[in-house]
Amino acid sequence: MSFRPIKEKKSAQPFIEGAGVSLFRAFGFRDPEECDPFLMLDDFRNDDPEKFKAGFPWHPHRGIETITYVLDGTIEHQDSLGNKGILSGGDVQWMTAGSGILHQEMPLGNAKGQMHGFQLWANLPGSQKMVNPRYQDVSHSDIPLLEEDDGSKIKVVVGGYKGVNGPVDGIAADPQYFDVYVPPNTKKEISVDAYRNCFAYIFQGSANFAYSSKPMGVRIEKELNGEELNIRDLSGNRTLIRFDSGDSISLYSGENGVRFLLVSGKPIQEPVAWHGPIVMNTREELTQAFSDLRNGTFIKPLH
């Protein structure tokens, strides 16, 4: 087994999006290759309705897929295909924008005025950028939860883990998307296919994802099963960790445990032309998309 070392660790940055929604961006709009095939991850977590209720009014997308995962609160959505609905805590929505879609997402929060969820953008390869748009809404009750002997809990949102498959399928990036909880002071190893790019996003508690590489020149603070363990630098809330190559990730959770998203996907390795909500392969395709918007031809006939 080859553990994935950390390639990069950074904190999510505050952003204002939509009509004035305060959120934290883990990555996106900097280097489209850094998490290929994924383009962006937003953490929309807020206890003040004034900072999210303006929402994300009608806007276009082309050339991408989005995966929205709601932890708490509700989101009302509708689109140019005539779909309409409400996502509640634990629900997931996958949208393939393909050739073009207009939609809006309006966070409503919970009874206490709180809202928390994530939206991940995945790129589409050039051969699929103009496919028909489509939606898939998945109820929290349909998302399998694995409870392991060490007390860990893994929700399999997309992809498969230990023979259990998540309900969301058909995404071009062939992702694995897990919501992972590891109890306090626990060593955990999770397999990730070696051909995938992989990242973790911590949103509760803390953990050390780097100890397995046995870094030199740092203070050793603990011992686990006879192994020296470096826990000097725990990664905590709103931390993104990008992993290098290997076939598994390894961590040791902090005194309050840790909860994080673990996401991986097969890199597309194609040119990216990206502006706002539209992602194509060339500048010419991008220019055409915005011309279609201006001319009223953005929404294509289904085929």
What are these regions (language model features)?
Residues 1-303:
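Jelly-roll (double-stranded beta-helix
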